[in-house]
A protein has these predicted regions:
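Positively charged, solvent-exposed patches that mediate nucleic-acid binding
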Residues: 1-127
Length: 127
């Protein structure tokens, strides 16, 4: 994947409150390492996958810490999304993803990246 393909574009961000609520009500859940992943397939999306990331305030009181965690999750997603996108383009489906950190400790980037890639592999087996 070239450098242009490794961007996390606006079209890939899950930002619609209606869609997020639908995802939490009707989505499927699985755990991957330090992440809880809520996902749902969709047929009428512009992008192959849309993703959102969350770090709970209950576990990480400081906003700077939560922002750092979300930044690491987005970076790991951006660098490894080709794993998921290759499969999705073959199957001609789109998917909504919501990643929530479940660890009580501050994860490093390698742990986050490992959990994201495990989540992609698990998701591929579930679709």
């Amino acid at each position: 994947m070239d450098i242009a393909g490794k961007r996390f574009r606006k079209e890939e961000k899950l930002s619609s409150q209606k869609t997020i609520n639908s995802l939490f009500e009707n989505g499927n859940i699985f755990y991957s390492g330090i992440l809880k992943v809520i996902w749902k397939t969709n047929n009428d999306s512009v992008s192959a996958a849309k993703a959102a990331f969350s770090a709970p305030k209950k576990m990480f009181k400081l906003a700077i810490t939560r922002n750092l965690i979300k930044r690491r999750m987005r970076e790991a997603y951006r660098n490894n999304k080709h794993i998921l996108y290759n499969y999705i383009s073959e199957k001609n489906v789109s998917v909504y993803l919501f990643f929530i950190l479940t660890s009580k400790n501050m994860p490093d980037y390698k742990t986050t990246e490992k959990s994201i890639t495990e989540a992609f592999n698990k998701l591929i087996s579930l679709i």
